[in-house]
């Protein structure tokens, strides 16, 4: 895959339920602590190395941000690092929280 794909929150949720992909959240620490998808890994410059050590390049990665814009750059970056399949989640955390309020965790 040379280009990331966009995915809606319903499809992203299904991929998580079926363990077909991992979810990363690239928002700032304060926003992440105020609420994030239950299964999200908080991906930052400081946690990138750990994420890459723990997730093979053939593991599909879904990137979540605030509204679905910043995630596109991060998705492209992960492709450039060697990940085979990367998705940017349309609508970001705001859409996730609206559609799946019961699947939001709080705290870091």
Swiss-Prot record:
Main location: cytoplasm
GO CC terms, sorted: cytoplasm
Gene Ontology molecular functions: thiosulfate-cyanide sulfurtransferase activity
UniProt-listed InterPro entries: GlpE_sulfurtransferase (IPR050229), Rhodanese-like_dom (IPR001763), Rhodanese-like_dom_sf (IPR036873), Thiosulf_sulfurTrfase (IPR023695)
GO biological process: glycerol metabolic process
Matching PROSITE patterns: RHODANESE_3
EC number per UniProt: 2.8.1.1
One Pfam family recorded for the sequence: Rhodanese
Classification via PANTHER family: FAD-DEPENDENT OXIDOREDUCTASE (PTHR43031), THIOSULFATE SULFURTRANSFERASE GLPE (PTHR43031:SF6)
Known role: Transferase that catalyzes the transfer of sulfur from thiosulfate to thiophilic acceptors such as cyanide or dithiols. May function in a CysM-independent thiosulfate assimilation pathway by catalyzing the conversion of thiosulfate to sulfite, which can then be used for L-cysteine biosynthesis.
NCBIfam families associated with the record: PRK00162.1
Protein name: Thiosulfate sulfurtransferase GlpE
UniProt organism field: Escherichia coli O157:H7
Organism lineage string: Bacteria, Pseudomonadati, Pseudomonadota, Gammaproteobacteria, Enterobacterales
Gene: glpE
């Amino acid at each position: 895959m040379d280009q990331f794909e966009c995915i809606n929150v319903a499809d992203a949720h299904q991929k998580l339920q079926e363990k077909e992909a991992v979810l990363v959240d690239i928002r700032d620490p304060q926003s992440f602590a105020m609420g994030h998808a239950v299964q999200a890994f908080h991906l930052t410059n400081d946690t990138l190395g750990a994420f890459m050590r723990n997730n093979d390049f053939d593991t599909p990665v879904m990137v979540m941000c605030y509204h679905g814009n910043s995630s596109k750059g991060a998705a492209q970056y992960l492709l450039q690092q060697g990940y085979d399949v990367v998705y940017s989640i349309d609508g970001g955390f705001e859409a996730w929280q609206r559609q799946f309020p019961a699947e939001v965790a709080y705290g870091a």
